[in-house]
Regions:
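Membrane-embedded beta-barrel scaffold of Gram-negative outer-membrane proteins
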Residues: 365-369, 558, 566, 594-652, ...
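Structural signature of Gram-negative outer-membrane beta-barrels, strongest in the C-terminal barrel
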Residues: 421-423, 444, 493-624
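Surface-exposed extracellular loop regions of Gram-negative outer-membrane beta-barrel proteins
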Residues: 218, 254-273, 285, 320, ...
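Short, acidic, small-residue-rich periplasmic hinge/interaction motif at the N-terminus
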Residues: 32-37, 43-45, 72-78, 88-133, ...
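C-terminal beta-signal and adjacent terminal beta-strands/loops
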Residues: 665-668, 719-727, 752-820
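Gram-negative outer-membrane beta-barrel transporters
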Residues: 516-521, 623-625, 644-728, 817-819
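Periplasmic N-terminal accessory/gating domains of Gram-negative outer-membrane beta-barrel systems
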Residues: 79, 86-89, 115-211, 222, ...
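Transmembrane beta-barrel wall of Gram-negative outer-membrane proteins
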Residues: 236, 242-265, 278-317, 341-370, ...
């Protein structure tokens, strides 16, 4: 079976299908008159094709993709509106024109969405791809991790690192509102659902660095999500062995009010129960999201984004056997567990947004949001282990069992960690357009209140002896001198904190776009300012301020070749969030400074036709110089900071992505990334940073059977070289510069569309707009990837063995999707 799958994947890349499907995109929206009323019976047309708006003014028009199309809106006694646009294959774009009173007046608005994003250094992809692409955590993040410069070595986690940064250095916006992730997550299997709901998504934009001043104060990347507005009643259901989702949307008869809501449920048992640790595992990840809009008038619109999530995680490990070593010297670790872990995460998020169009050239926005979370991490787990040789005698009834134990011991881990946080934001933004010039500005106030209790320890016993912490200055001269020190845990951390952080930040930026020197020139310059005050209730409050100037320049020469050259340079600061203020002893250090990074990014985009189909080659070379670096350790997905600005670092590399229609009518890409990042802590010399992932290859591929186009395939393959790590958490990184094994994974999804727009349902399926069934194969080659090591000592030789903690093996999943 596996051999056939390998052959299939090779054939996919060598023998591309010869069938040709039409390339289309969808333009939709609502037509309004000057009074804000929807226009029924208006004609929406391009070339010789067209549709008429329904009684609510709604239209849906399919147009050719990857080419400039002029669309005209016309209605008796109203001005004719005409505009040109270029959309990608399968892209959905919403446009709501306003037709003023008059007759036969022709105005033109040139709109090239992809081109505008390209000159700003933004990568965009269809949300439909995020909905259909296969992955351990399918959705937007699964697609991101196939991009160059983006790495993630845990299929159960939605967290990602970009160009040498860590998980805390990425901005995520939904409808221009910043969203947050949980604080106490230690492993991917605890995470559950991502905030971003791919079924509600209309646009996905991503920048891997060198982004503009209008985005916030983080060092690495920006993910900008826009939720969609339904144009008619809709409902969809997605079911699988991993959970399910129900999404419902509708609008009012006059088109002023729209509502979109979704309920999601996820159960990771399919993944966790397939791992080598036998468990009683009962996770329950549930969330509810809603997006509401109301058009008060032609100038004022209100929006609401809300979410509530309840995550319950109950984990009771029973036994584990991990085989390692070589063929000549096979070894195994056998562990028996007692105890359990019970975690709870309760999150509520709400945001209000008002958009007011003062004039055709001036738009303002007011936003207010609140994020509240209550998190609990409680566990008491006793692990008793045996380390020894494995019985390899074929035919023996004890084949594969551990015998001749070389290490016997136990480990007790305990935690009572609780956290409550309330984050409130008030934000104002404005945009002024004057000819080829555009000015944007913003001002934001944030108040963060975090209450945290940490109480955790680890006790290790080996052959009846309690192992003391690995302290450098510890001395034990037994039996010559009596040792009367108390027994202490091998590792411990405790503390209680109540911290209030107040922030005021703002930005102003100017953009210019016009023809210059036989080409098109785009300039952008801006600056951010950020002032914050930390009050921990114990020490005197600390106030700091940073300024971050940034600039971009893009040039697109006229001519037969579609090329774009781009330069970005700027200073990026990351003022400390709560996690970065807390050291490894769980103490808050208010004096921690903002980390600073100077970015230089050179980019080149080249669009061309291959096999008479469109392709684009994106290339970027980047360099980062970082100062006031706050060192951290990475264990699984848990970050622990030193809360010291005692390091400097650098990162440089190359990102390349070839995207296009490898198969007619579908978008796929192949990506390559090279990265080197090192840090110098306390002038001890440069060493690898925890996210120094040297090479990255990614393939995201869509295919179909030419004679049966409803049978489709989705392939997601990633290869990452190993991260520095795998050493004990207490180890000095200057003493342990080892790397984990390379991360290799391929996920395959196959689906069949029983009902769609061009294939109406019959019989029991007649009430569905679309209906599809499929199967997913995760980790199709059954590669054993590891993200951490468990260290066990041999009592006889005093040698410590690094036992890999493997991630998920090959898993099969069934999937069903239906739309009404």
């Amino acid at each position: 079976m596996i051999k056939r799958l390998k052959t299939l994947i090779v054939l996919v890349f060598v023998l591309l299908p010869f069938g040709l499907l039409s390339q289309t995109a969808t333009l939709k929206g609502i037509v309004f008159d000057g009074e804000g009323n929807s226009v029924s019976g208006a004609t929406v047309a391009y070339a010789n094709q067209g549709v008429v708006t329904d009684r609510n003014g709604v239209y849906v028009l399919e147009i050719p993709a990857e080419k400039k199309v002029t669309v005209t809106f016309s209605f008796l006694s109203l001005k004719t509106v005409s505009f040109a646009l270029t959309l990608a294959a399968n892209e959905d774009y919403e446009f709501n024109p306003v037709m003023q009173a008059d007759i036969e007046v022709f105005g033109e608005l040139v709109l090239d969405v992809k081109k505008r994003k390209r000159i700003e250094g933004i990568q965009s992809f269809s949300p439909e791809m995020a909905r259909k692409m296969v992955g351990g955590n399918s959705g937007v993040e699964a697609v991101l991790m196939s991009l160059p410069g983006v790495s993630g070595n845990n299929e159960l986690s939605t967290q990602y690192a970009v160009r040498g940064g860590n998980y805390d250095e990425n901005l995520v916006y939904v409808n221009e509102i910043e969203v947050y992730r949980p604080f106490l997550i230690r492993s991917g299997q605890q995470e559950g659902l991502s905030f971003v709901n791919s079924q509600m998504t209309a646009n996905v934009d991503f920048s891997a660095g060198g982004f503009q001043a209008k985005y916030g104060d983080k060092l690495s990347s920006v993910l900008d999500i826009t939720y969609r507005r339904p144009t008619d009643f809709e409902a969809s259901v997605d079911l699988s062995l991993l959970g399910g989702q129900l999404t419902v949307g509708d609008k009012s008869e006059d088109g002023r009010f729209t509502a979109l809501g979704s309920v999601r449920y996820r159960d990771n048992s399919l993944f966790v129960n397939a791992k080598e640790t036998e468990t009683n595992f009962r996770p329950r990840f549930t969330d509810l999201q809603s997006y509401l809009t109301y058009k008060v008038s032609n100038k004022l619109e209100l929006g609401f984004l809300g979410t509530a999530s309840i995550n319950d995680y109950r984990y009771e490990p029973l036994t584990r056997q991990t085989n390692f070593g070589t063929i000549q010297d096979p070894r195994a670790l056998l562990v028996f567990y007692e105890g359990q872990e019970v975690d709870q995460y309760r999150t509520v998020f709400g945001a209000l947004k008002a958009t007011y169009v003062i004039s055709d050239n001036y738009t303002t926005k007011w936003m207010a949001s609140a994020y509240q979370t209550a998190e609990q991490e409680h566990y008491d787990i006793l692990a008793q282990y045996r380390l020894g040789e494995v019985n390899t005698s074929i035919g023996d009834e004890n084949l594969g069992e551990v015998e001749f134990s070389e290490g016997i011991g136990s480990q007790l881990t305990h935690a009572r960690n609780d956290l409550e946080a309330l984050i409130v934001n008030i934000n104002h933004r404005g945009q002024i357009q004057s000819g080829v010039h555009q000015v944007e500005y913003g001002l934001k106030y944030t108040n963060e209140r975090i209450r945290d209790r940490v109480s955790e320890y680890e006790i290790i016993d080996s052959a009846g002896f309690s192992i003391r912490p690995p302290l450098v200055d510890f001395q034990n001269n037994q039996p010559y001198e009596a040792f009367d020190s108390p027994i202490v845990p091998f590792n411990a951390s405790s503390g209680e904190n109540d911290v209030v952080i107040s922030r005021i930040s703002g930005f102003a930026q100017w953009s210019y776009r016009d023809e210059w020197n036989n080409g098109e020139l785009y300039l952008n310059a801006g600056v951010r300012a950020h002032n914050w005050q930390v009050d921990d209730g114990v020490n005197a409050s600390v106030t700091q301020t940073v300024f971050s100037p940034r600039a971009q320049m893009s040039f697109k020469p006229f001519g037969s070749k579609d090329q774009l050259f781009r330069l970005s340079v700027g200073v990026y600061h990351q003022p400390p969030f709560y996690r970065e203020l807390r050291n490894r002893q769980s103490e808050v250090v208010p004096q921690v400074k903002a980390q600073q990074s100077i970015h230089l990014v050179l980019g080149h985009d080249y669009s061309f036709n291959l096999w008479e189909r469109p392709f684009t080659l994106n290339s970027e070379v980047f360099y980062k110089h970082l100062t006031d670096v706050n060192p951290y350790t990475l264990e699984n997905v848990r970050l622990r900071y030193a809360a010291l600005n005692n390091a400097v670092a650098y990162a440089y590399g190359l990102d390349m992505r070839l995207a296009g229609e490898f198969v007619p009518g579908t978008e796929s890409w192949v990506s390559f990334g090279y990265l080197k990042t090192e840090e110098n802590i306390d002038d001890r010399g440069f060493i690898f940073r925890p996210t120094d992932q040297r090479l990255k290859f990614g393939v995201l591929f869509q295919d179909y059977v030419p004679v049966m186009p409803d049978l489709k395939m989705y392939l997601n393959m990633v290869y990452n070289t190993g991260l520095p790590g795998g050493s004990p958490s207490y180890a000095d990184p200057y003493d342990f510069q080892t790397r984990l094994p390379d991360y290799k994974r391929a996920d395959l999804g196959i689906s069949y569309d029983l009902v769609h727009d061009n294939k109406p349902g019959k019989g029991l399926l007649s009430s569905f707009k679309d209906f599809a069934v499929g199967v997913e194969i995760f980790n199709i080659f059954d590669v054993q990837n590891s993200i951490t090591n468990t260290f066990v000592r041999d009592v006889y030789t005093k040698v410590q063995y690094a036992i890999p903690n493997y991630l998920t093996p090959r898993i099969f999943n069934l999937k069903l999707s239906a739309g009404f």
